[in-house]
Design a protein with these regions (language model features):
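A conserved acidic beta->alpha catalytic loop
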Residues: 44-53, 71, 101-102
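Glycine-rich, basic loop-to-helix element that forms the pyrophosphate-binding segment
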Residues: 69-88
Length: 297
């Protein structure tokens, strides 16, 4: 039986949410999202038994499907498992979400309308919402090309046609975490499609907790304070990405490598765990050059 054979019962809009040691806020995020989609698929990446059981109970109450991986398989694999389930159940549209993202009223309806509006004029691959930091209330700046389309797209809150995902393939499992969204964005752009923003659809999203600093009372800057593990995957995956997309998108990678060295300097100046983070940074570089991929830490 194909999806065409079950036209009358197929869920039109599916959402995939990846969880990892979810807190109480995640339950509210899922409750806000569930009424806005036909099918909600939650993929848990190795949370505690108690957390998984809580998700299971909530799934029974709200009517969503839980896929419990049992261990941390990485964000790419988790997204792929959720997307595959959506394809199996004949979804036409797929939303992807992080656990710390919360939809606003009418979010999915605005995104679907926005997608159709853009796609009527240009070949569209991914549509993202307007991201607002839930702590500060500030919008997240986006990087645009001269034609107004986006350079890359954040995965959380993004919308794709199921057919586009089927054509372009799964997220890159070998990246494990970090750069997963950049990689897929470049794959979309290389296919001749664009990335666009729907400004009317607002998604409250955690944009990190950068810490402000002042050097000599004059130079003001922010440090990212990423963990050693995050540092490792950032640098390793950046090299893998350059190997695959550097010639096609040289300006992006020039900026990314410059940012790496600036972040390393900030790390040495003001962050804690300097030695652990520095070791992770250079180990990531070394493993990237050796093409040692997958889960390594």
């Amino acid at each position: 039986m194909t999806c065409d054979d079950v036209e009358t019962v197929k869920p039109r809009v599916a959402a995939v949410v990846v969880t990892y040691h979810p807190d109480e806020d995640v339950q509210m995020h899922l409750a806000a999202l569930r009424p806005q989609v036909d099918q909600l698929i939650v993929v848990d990446n190795g949370s505690s038994d108690a957390a998984v059981e809580k998700l299971r109970r909530q799934g029974e109450e709200l009517g969503f499907e839980l896929i419990a991986n049992g261990e941390n398989l990485g964000v790419a694999t988790a997204l792929n498992r959720g997307a595959q389930r959506a394809l199996e159940t004949c979804a036409e549209w797929i939303f992807f979400f992080d656990q710390d993202s919360c939809v606003t009223d009418g979010f999915t309806a605005k995104m679907l309308a926005g997608y159709d509006s853009v796609a009527a004029r240009r070949p569209l691959g991914i549509l993202v919402p307007r991201y607002v930091d839930r702590q500060s209330g500030n919008p997240h700046p986006v990087m645009r090309l001269p034609d107004g389309s986006l350079i890359t797209a954040i995965t959380s809150g993004s919308l794709m046609r199921a057919g586009t995902f089927r054509e372009l393939g799964s997220f890159a499992d070998e990246l494990f975490i970090d750069s997963v969204d950049h990689e897929y964005s470049f794959r979309v752009r290389r296919s001749g499609r664009i990335l666009a923003e729907c400004e009317s659809a607002v998604l409250f999203h955690s944009l990190g907790m950068p810490k402000p600093h002042s050097l000599l009372g004059v130079f003001r800057f922010q440090s990212t304070n990423h963990s050693p593990v995050r540092r490792y995957y950032q640098e390793r995956n950046k090299i893998w990405m350059y190997r695959h997309y550097g010639l096609a998108f040289p300006a992006f990678f020039a900026q990314e490598f410059l940012r790496s060295f600036v972040d390393l300097a900030k790390l040495e100046l003001v962050e804690r765990e300097k030695w652990a983070k520095t070791k992770a940074f250079f180990r990531g570089v070394a493993d990237g050059l050796r093409n040692r991929m997958g889960r390594c830490l």
